């Protein structure tokens, strides 16, 4: 029908993770945790998310609806679950790790226009399902590191029964037929609710969910039973009988104290051993050396700090998921627990508001974002951190706001970004040359930003160079605006150093205040949170938390504040 179907048997194994009864049961974390366990058994694992929405990618979605956009090394805007995959597997994934209905239909329609289907009537089956299968099977090829995986774990978004998910489930069913039943494992995540009035756990929702899955031709090999408490053995036996799975394959997964405990929960229930046995994979013991040390740092901190996250989307923490996980990982590096104070940036627009929201925190983080709302509050928070000597880290938009605040501090009172004020007299932040058409509405917004990993050169002896332990770094980006080079010399008179640039020196990547002026005041145009791992904290986040610990233990005295500025701030407070 215009495409070649895969019929040959393969050494690579496929695990499909589906969900039933309700959304937000933790399919992504379950898949990530299983991937971590198989990796700890010495297997090469890669992961993929199938999203049933019609958007080509989440890049243009409202963060309040979808959460953060996770950017891969090769510049794809992907689902936040891909971030979980990278953190749990401790490896970089490519753009192939996220497939959407929008991508599938766009590809099929483009092929039809080119005449690749040789006059066929293009239909959901086989053309859409074949395209999905090709995307799934492509994960068996060499990854970004040039290695071929032993196992591909594919999470199917949505809930069984959703119209949008049907082509993806059908494609998964066909893959079991194409590559051999011994090479595919179906894992279904379902809810077992507890009814307080009767004091009972109810199995009917899971039974109906599995029945819906079987109705489309998929018999699950194992069930993840999500509940707020342990599912007793008697109920496991009942579910096993009614859903036609082995009792050992009914995995009780009560809520865990930390997401990093989930691999231990699954291992205790024997899921990884069951998967290895069913797929005929080599059996090796789990090496808990690295993950065990992580759990020790998670549950046995020696210190505690509070970090204010001053953002626009704080009503939905998932909008900053990688940032919060990177902060916590930075704490793990110092064996410290990081408590996050969510501060809506609007609260910090005045000196009094900033003081009320931030006066007793140990560090401040200014994350990325888009649009004018809340910008003056971010600038106000930066001013408070600079004048009070509070450790600060700015990310992407955070760097731009740091530059705006520095410019205003030296008399450019109306300094701004052309994103917020196109006709500003002092555009210290301007549109990148290759982004002007998109900003003007003359080109697509989706997928057109400066995306993916780019190198930077750091100034020798700078705060950031010492944090990284290197003068050559690479970070992921997602932005359309940059520091206006025409203002660099002028802004430098404020004391702000441009300590990292692109290799050609044209794009500002890092700014900072020297260590002798401020304990830690750093911002980057990049998104370093995307490369942080719980077992390998990112250097900038580790440095921020280390500075926060020192700040907490030291006397909190203002640092190098002019008398008139100090008096003004105190009057405002």
From Swiss-Prot:
Binding-site list for UTP: 23, 202-207, 238
EC numbers on record: 6.3.4.2
Record-linked CDD domains: CTPS_N, GATase1_CTP_Synthase
Residues holding ATP: 24-29, 81
Residues annotated to bind Mg(2+): 81, 155
GO biological process: 'de novo' CTP biosynthetic process; pyrimidine nucleobase biosynthetic process
MF annotations from Gene Ontology: ATP binding; CTP synthase activity; glutaminase activity; identical protein binding; metal ion binding
Region (Amidoligase domain): 1-281
Activity regulation annotation text: Allosterically activated by GTP, when glutamine is the substrate; GTP has no effect on the reaction when ammonia is the substrate. The allosteric effector GTP functions by stabilizing the protein conformation that binds the tetrahedral intermediate(s) formed during glutamine hydrolysis. Inhibited by the product CTP, via allosteric rather than competitive inhibition.
Binding sites annotated in the UniProt record for CTP: 23, 162-164, 202-207, 238
Protein name per UniProt: CTP synthase
């Amino acid at each position: 029908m215009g495409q070649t179907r895969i019929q040959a048997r393969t050494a690579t194994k496929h695990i499909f993770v589906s969900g039933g009864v309700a959304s937000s049961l933790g399919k992504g974390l379950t898949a990530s945790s299983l991937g971590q366990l198989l990796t700890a058994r010495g297997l090469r694992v890669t992961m993929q998310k199938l999203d049933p929405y019609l958007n080509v990618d989440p890049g243009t979605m409202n963060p309040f609806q979808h959460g953060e956009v996770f950017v891969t090394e090769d510049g794809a805007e992907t689902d936040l679950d891909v971030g979980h995959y990278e953190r749990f597997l401790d490896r970089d994934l490519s753009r192939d790790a996220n497939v959407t209905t929008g991508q599938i239909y766009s590809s099929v329609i483009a092929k039809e226009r080119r005449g690749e289907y040789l006059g066929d009537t293009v239909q959901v089956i086989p053309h859409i399902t074949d395209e999905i299968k090709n995307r799934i099977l492509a994960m068996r090829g060499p990854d970004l590191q040039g290695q071929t995986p032993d196992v591909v774990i594919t999470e199917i978004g949505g809930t069984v029964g959703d119209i949008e998910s049907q082509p993806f489930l059908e494609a998964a069913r066909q893959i079991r037929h194409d590559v051999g039943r011994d090479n595919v494992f179906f894992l279904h995540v379902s809810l077992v609710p507890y009814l307080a009035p009767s004091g009972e756990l109810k199995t009917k929702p899971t039974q109906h969910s599995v029945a819906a899955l079987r109705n489309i031709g998929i018999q699950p090999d194992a069930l993840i039973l999500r509940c707020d408490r342990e599912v007793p053995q008697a109920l496991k036996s009942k579910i096993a009988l009614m859903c036609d799975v082995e009792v050992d394959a009914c995995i009780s997964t009560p809520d865990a104290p930390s997401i990093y405990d989930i691999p231990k929960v699954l291992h205790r229930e024997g899921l990884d051993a069951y998967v290895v046995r069913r797929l005929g994979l080599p059996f090796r013991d789990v090496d808990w050396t690295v993950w065990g040390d992580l759990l020790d740092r998670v549950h046995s901190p020696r210190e505690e700090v509070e970090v204010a996250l001053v953002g626009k989307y704080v009503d939905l923490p998932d909008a900053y998921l990688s940032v919060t996980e990177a902060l916590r990982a930075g704490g793990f590096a110092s064996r410290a627990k990081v408590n996050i104070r969510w501060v809506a940036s609007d609260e910090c627009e005045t000196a009094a508001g900033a003081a009320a929201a931030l006066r007793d925190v140990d560090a401040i983080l200014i994350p990325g974002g888009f649009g004018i709302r809340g910008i003056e509050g971010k600038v106000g928070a930066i001013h408070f951190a600079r004048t009070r000597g509070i450790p600060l880290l700015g990310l992407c938009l955070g760097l731009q706001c740091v530059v705006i605040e520095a410019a205003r501090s030296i008399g450019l009172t109306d300094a701004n970004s052309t994103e917020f004020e196109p006709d500003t007299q002092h555009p210290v932040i301007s549109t990148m040359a290759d982004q002007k058409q998109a900003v003007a509405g003359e080109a697509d917004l989706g997928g057109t930003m400066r995306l993916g990993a780019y190198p930077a050169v750091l100034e020798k002896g700078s705060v950031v160079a010492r944090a990284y332990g290197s003068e050559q770094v690479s970070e992921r980006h997602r932005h359309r605006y940059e520091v206006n080079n025409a203002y660099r010399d002028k802004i430098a008179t404020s004391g702000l150093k441009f300590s990292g640039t692109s290799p050609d020196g044209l794009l500002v990547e890092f700014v900072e205040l020297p260590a002798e002026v401020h304990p830690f005041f750093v911002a980057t145009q990049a998104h370093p949170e995307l490369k942080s791992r719980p077992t390998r904290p990112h250097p900038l986040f580790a440095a921020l938390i280390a500075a926060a610990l020192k700040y907490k233990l030291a006397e909190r005295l203002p640092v190098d504040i002019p008398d008139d500025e100090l008096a003004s701030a105190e009057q405002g407070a």
